[in-house]
């Protein structure tokens, strides 16, 4: 009986989550919507502060989530089937944490109850991003913020 009192992310695998549980894991940091560059020599993935054209630069939410694939065909859609590849996600990402059997951080909205905590704790890049429409792709390297992995 005690196991059922555990939050869903502690008692279920990613593959066992229903759609609402899956979507609720997203903390709204927007980091997965930042443009990334891959080092050709070692395969390392680097995040830039260049945001997808659909990402709201303040709220860190997609401005057209339901239709994002139509507007951004290469938009990354995370699924439980990809869990073994989540190492490219930020170390704070709930999808990555749960896939690694780890708990959610204290600021995550499912723990804290505060959807703005991700911004207050400066986990998100809210207010610190640039739209991909404002930076030439050849200049993205000038805007690296961290290495994934």
From Swiss-Prot:
A Pfam family that the UniProt record links to this protein: CxxCxxCC
InterPro entries noted in UniProt: Puta_zinc/iron-chelating_dom, UCP006173
Top-rank lineage group of the source organism: Bacteria
PANTHER family in UniProt: UPF0260 PROTEIN YCGN
Similarity section: Belongs to the UPF0260 family.
Protein name (database record): UPF0260 protein Pmen_1776
């Amino acid at each position: 009986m005690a196991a059922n009192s555990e939050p869903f992310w502690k008692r279920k695998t990613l593959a066992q989550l229903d759609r609402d549980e899956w979507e609720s894991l997203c903390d709204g940091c927007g980091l997965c919507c930042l443009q990334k560059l891959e080092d050709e020599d070692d395969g390392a993935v680097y995040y830039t502060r260049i945001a997808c054209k659909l990402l709201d630069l303040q709220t860190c939410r997609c401005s057209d989530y339901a239709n994002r694939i139509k507007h951004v065909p290469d938009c990354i859609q995370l699924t439980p089937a990809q869990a073994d590849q989540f190492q490219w996600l930020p170390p704070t990402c709930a999808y990555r944490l749960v896939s690694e059997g780890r708990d959610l951080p204290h600021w995550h909205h499912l723990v804290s109850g505060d959807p703005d905590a991700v911004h207050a704790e400066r986990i998100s890049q809210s207010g610190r991003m640039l739209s991909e429409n404002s930076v030439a792709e050849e200049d993205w390297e000038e805007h690296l913020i961290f290495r994934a992995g």
